[in-house]
UniProtKB/Swiss-Prot annotation:
Domain ApaG: from-to ranges: 3-127
InterPro entries, per database record: ApaG_domain, ApaG_sf, Uncharacterised_ApaG
Organism, as annotated: Methylobacterium nodulans (strain LMG 21967 / CNCM I-2342 / ORS 2060)
PANTHER family assigned to the protein according to its UniProt record, in alphabetical order: F-BOX ONLY PROTEIN 3 (PTHR14289), POLYMERASE DELTA-INTERACTING PROTEIN 2 (PTHR14289:SF16)
Lineage: Bacteria, Pseudomonadati, Pseudomonadota, Alphaproteobacteria, Hyphomicrobiales
Name of the protein this chain belongs to: Protein ApaG
GO biological process: error-free translesion synthesis
C-alpha cells in the first residue's frame, strides 16, 4: 500500500500482479492497481483529470493523460471516498507508476493531488534446486 496526501486529498494505491492476464514468454506482464481517494478536507472537490507516468524496468517512460478515472469524474464531499481498480501492461516484470489528479473546488480553483509512486513487481518465483 502506498499513500500520499495533498490539501486534504488522500490517495492510497494497492498494486498487484495479475498472472492470468500475463504472458512472460511474450514479454507481457499485467498489473492491476486499486486506488482509494478520500476527501479529508473541508471543501467539496471534483476529480477532473489524471496524469500518469509509467516507467518500465528498462527505464522507458510512458505518459497517460485523460479526463476523470474509469469514465467518471467523481465529486467528493468532506469525508467521502471513491475507489476504483484499473490495470497496466508492461513489457518487463517490474516498473513504477506515479502521477497526479487534477482536482477542482466548487469555486473553480484547481490543484494537483499527488498519486504516490508505487512499484509494479512480479512476485519472486520459488526456485527449485535439483
Amino acid at each position: 500500500m502506498y499513500k500520499a496526501e495533498t490539501r486534504g486529498i488522500s490517495v492510497i494505491v494497492t498494486p498487484r500482479f495479475v498472472e492470468e492476464e500475463s504472458s512472460p514468454d511474450e514479454s507481457r506482464y499485467f498489473f492491476a492497481y486499486t486506488v482509494e481517494i478520500t476527501n479529508n478536507g473541508r471543501d467539496r472537490v471534483q476529480l477532473r483529470s489524471r496524469h500518469w507516468r509509467i516507467i518500465d524496468g528498462r527505464g522507458a517512460l510512458q505518459e497517460v493523460r485523460g479526463a476523470g478515472v474509469v469514465g467518471k469524474q467523481p465529486v467528493l464531499g468532506p469525508g467521502e471516498s471513491f475507489s476504483y481498480t484499473s490495470g497496466c501492461p508492461l513489457p518487463t516484470p517490474n516498473g513504477t507508476m506515479e502521477g497526479t489528479y487534477t482536482m477542482a473546488t466548487a469555486d473553480g480553483e484547481s490543484f494537483e493531488a499527488v498519486i504516490p509512486a508505487f512499484s509494479l513487481d512480479v512476485p519472486h518465483m520459488r526456485r527449485v534446486m535439483h
